[in-house]
A protein has these predicted regions:
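Short helix-capping/hinge SLiMs at alpha-helix to coil transitions
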Residues: 18-21, 35-39, 76-77
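Positively charged, polyanion-binding regions of nucleic-acid-associated proteins
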Residues: 1-27
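Short, solvent-exposed beta-strand-terminating loops
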Residues: 25-37
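A short, conserved structural fragment
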Residues: 68-78
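Short amphipathic alpha-helical elements of helix-turn-helix/winged-helix folds
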Residues: 12-20, 32, 63, 90
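Short, positively charged loop/turn segments that connect secondary-structure elements
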Residues: 2-4, 34-60
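Minor-groove-contacting beta-hairpin "wing" of winged helix-turn-helix DNA-binding domains
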Residues: 79-84
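Short, amphipathic alpha-helical interaction segments positioned at domain boundaries
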Residues: 86-97
Length: 97
């Protein structure tokens, strides 16, 4: 499997945030989403061209950034965020994957 783009990670990330009581970190999301999506070790080792960050971790981070801008996630403190009421309302509508 290839590493999904950040748009494809938005709903799984929001769903993960919605199942947690309280805040999450990108590292927690990376670990859980990698398992849920069935990514291989090779997929997880893939690095950005700069060689400074994993491609998957980067894309999970961008998915979180854009969902924060949309008001679906909110930062709670540095490196932590949680689902908002708006995010919970969206999940309750059962959006298509």
């Amino acid at each position: 499997m290839t590493v999904p783009d950040y748009q494809s990670l938005m709903l799984p990330l929001l769903t993960f945030a919605g199942t947690r009581q309280g805040e999450i970190t990108t590292n927690q999301a990376v670990e859980v989403l990698a398992q849920e999506l069935g990514l291989s070790e090779e997929d997880l080792r893939e690095m950005l061209p700069s060689g400074t960050q994993s491609t998957f971790g980067n894309r999970v981070g961008w998915a979180a950034t854009y969902m924060k801008k949309a008001g679906l996630l909110e930062p709670t403190r540095r490196g932590y965020y949680q689902i908002t009421e708006r995010g919970q309302e969206l999940l309750a509508q059962h959006p298509p994957a």
